[in-house]
A protein has these predicted regions:
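A short helix-coil junction within the Rossmann-fold of NAD(P)-dependent oxidoreductases
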Residues: 1-5, 49, 118
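Hydrophobic positions on the long internal alpha-helix
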Residues: 1, 45-46, 110, 114
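C-terminal substrate-binding subdomain of Rossmann-fold SDR/epimerase-dehydratase oxidoreductases
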Residues: 85-87, 91-95, 99-186
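Active-site proximal helix/loop that lines the substrate pocket
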Residues: 12-18, 64-70, 131
Length: 186
């Protein structure tokens, strides 16, 4: 369709594969999970088609979204469901790995801001820009939601294929958000 000027797709940090450190738009992707492989293939095909059709391409790379819906598959959804059931303990790893967490409302603001502007495109990390220990974020989540549940540390082993510390470079999303605040001030 010639009326479509921009193609924006929700990506995932899982398309990167095992990596430790800060991820930016130039970080090589070597996914090892079927989900990561599928997301990476979608990103590559969409980028090629957008270029062929002369469309602006935005790949919105999501990281770890924190929300209290009990219907998702994230650790936060599982804890919410367990708390709703009245469970007093939640089996957990040691929680030492560090990830980039973003609260759902902030995630939504970032995605909305990214797709409604035309200055920054390509791969845009929808992220906080900093790593945080899983145990710290989960404990804070439990407290924020006033859940009466405790983590049972060490019930599960840490997964050997999980990165010890992985987070997004937030340069592009910061630039977008600065542009949004400039427009609002005018």
């Amino acid at each position: 369709n010639t009326e479509i000027k921009t193609v924006a797709v929700m990506g995932s940090m899982h398309e990167i594969g095992f990596f430790e450190g800060s991820i930016d738009e130039n970080t090589s992707c070597r996914p090892e999970s079927f989900y990561g492989i599928a997301k990476n293939a979608l990103r590559e095909v969409t980028a090629i088609l957008a270029k062929q059709e002369k469309k602006t391409f935005m790949w919105l790379r999501g990281f770890y979204i924190v929300g209290n819906s009990q219907y998702g598959s994230s650790i936060f959804s599982k804890i919410s469901a367990a708390a709703e059931r009245g469970d007093k303990e939640f089996p957990f790893t040691m929680g030492l790995n560090q990830f980039d967490f973003l609260d759902y409302d902030v995630f939504c603001k970032y995605v909305s801001a990214a797709i409604t502007q035309d200055k920054v495109n390509g791969i845009i990390n929808i992220c906080s820009g900093r790593p945080e220990r899983l145990s710290d974020r989960v404990e804070r989540f439990i407290k924020e939601n006033d859940y009466n549940i405790k983590l049972k540390y060490g019930a599960f082993p840490d997964r050997p294929y999980d990165s010890k510390a992985i987070w997004g470079n937030d340069t592009k999303i910061k630039s977008i958000m600065e542009g949004v605040s400039t427009i609002i001030k005018k």
